[in-house]
Design a protein with these regions (language model features):
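Membrane-interacting alpha-helical segments
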Residues: 110-144, 179-182
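Amphipathic alpha-helical packing elements
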Residues: 141-173
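Charge-dense polyanion-binding interfaces
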Residues: 170-182
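Active-site T/S-Asp motif of two-component receiver
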Residues: 33-37
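Short amphipathic alpha-helix used as the core "switch/output" element in two-component signaling
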Residues: 20-21, 38-63
Length: 182
């Protein structure tokens, strides 16, 4: 998914090479990747093209949310090894799992401040409440969301592209303390 000209867009690519071109062209505007584990690369079906693509994307954009999907449950191990989420296409909860991933990582819905362990600590439904949350929640939550670009993705989903781009370009590790990030 990426945002251009005021709205988020979904780009569907037929092969590895086209996906790579899209990332090179739109990389700073992409809010996340959902990919099959297996898809065409160099003209033939490649059983690990999605994993290779995810690794390549992460080498350029380390905090990019990535979900790999497959009918083969054993591919979960490869996804886990590269820090990607995994979606089993034969799961009874497929649609709910996909929805949860998109809402949690691409900025749709309310902004839920969480700790790294997933514990929910505050919910913001608008920018005013987001600012209040940033002022009040634990530093650990701010660092977690800052490292993962959750703030910029959430703002981009609300057409706040200038602010989202400015936040995305910041690296929380460049600050002396968590309070400086706040």
């Amino acid at each position: 998914l990426l945002h251009l000209r005021g709205r988020l867009k979904v780009l569907l690519t037929p092969n590895y090479e086209t996906a790579e071109k899209f990332v090179n062209k739109y990389g700073n505007n992409i809010v996340g990747i959902i990919s099959d584990v297996r898809f065409p690369r160099n003209g033939t079906k490649n059983p690990t093209a999605g994993v290779e693509f995810a690794k390549w994307v992460r080498s350029i954009h380390p905090s990019m949310p990535v979900m790999l999907q497959s009918t083969d449950l054993e591919n979960h191990t490869m996804a886990e090894a590269i820090g990607a989420d995994f979606l089993h296409k034969n799961s009874n909860t497929l649609l709910q799992d996909l929805r949860d991933f998109i809402i949690s990582n691409f900025g749709f819905g309310d902004f839920t401040f969480r700790l790294e362990n997933g514990q929910k600590i505050y919910k913001a439904t608008n920018i005013k409440e987001l600012i209040k949350g940033i002022e009040e929640v634990q530093i650990e939550s701010i660092l977690f969301h800052g490292r993962s670009n959750h703030f910029s993705n959430w703002l981009a989903a609300r057409s706040e592209f200038n602010l989202a781009s400015r936040l995305r370009s910041l690296d929380v590790n460049q600050y002396e303390s968590g309070e400086d990030v706040r």
